[in-house]
């Protein structure tokens, strides 16, 4: 799975939220400054070529929908982050956030419970 550029990820976030959308429905959901319609149309076509989106035709207008789930992309992105920055070590990643005080004790406990329940 390819890593997406920042604007591509923003567009995919909109599709994952809306499920299906025409290009004109995507633009208001994107952060400012709003890109031009043609720019969004180009990026949507690129996302379709990369295998992230597909479309259904309504005459000469296309409604697009994601074929890669948010969860699948998140998993791939997290594997890349852990590989690139934490030497493939999830404990190192968690330790980093704990040391930076980005994770509270209650959040750490919640993570431990999630890990325990996923092992069952």
Task: Tell me what each language-model feature is.
Residues 41-45:
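Short, hydrophobic-biased segments on the C-terminal half of alpha helices
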Residues 9-14, 25:
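Pre-recognition alpha-helix immediately N-terminal to the DNA-recognition helix
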Residues 20-29:
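Short acidic, hydrophobic short linear motifs in intrinsically disordered regions
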Residues 15-19, 68:
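Short helix-capping/hinge SLiMs at alpha-helix to coil transitions
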Residues 55:
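Short beta-strand "wing" residues that participate in macromolecule-binding interfaces
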Residues 51:
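Glycine-centered, phosphate/nucleic-acid-interacting loop/turn motifs that mediate DNA/RNA or nucleotide
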Residues 4-7, 58-77:
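Short, cationic-aromatic polyanion-contact patches
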Residues 76-117:
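Amphipathic alpha-helical dimerization/coiled-coil segments
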């Amino acid at each position: 799975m390819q890593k997406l550029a920042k604007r591509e990820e923003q567009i995919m976030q909109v599709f994952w939220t809306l499920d299906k959308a025409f290009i004109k429905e995507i633009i208001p959901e994107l952060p400012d400054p709003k890109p031009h319609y043609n720019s969004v149309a180009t990026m949507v076509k690129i996302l379709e070529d990369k295998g992230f989106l597909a479309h259904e035709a309504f005459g000469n207008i296309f409604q697009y929908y994601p074929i890669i789930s948010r969860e699948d992309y998140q998993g791939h992105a997290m594997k890349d982050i852990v590989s690139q920055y934490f030497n493939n070590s999830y404990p190192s990643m968690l330790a980093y956030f704990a040391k930076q005080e980005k994770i509270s004790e209650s959040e750490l406990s919640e993570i431990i419970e999630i890990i325990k329940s996923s092992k069952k």
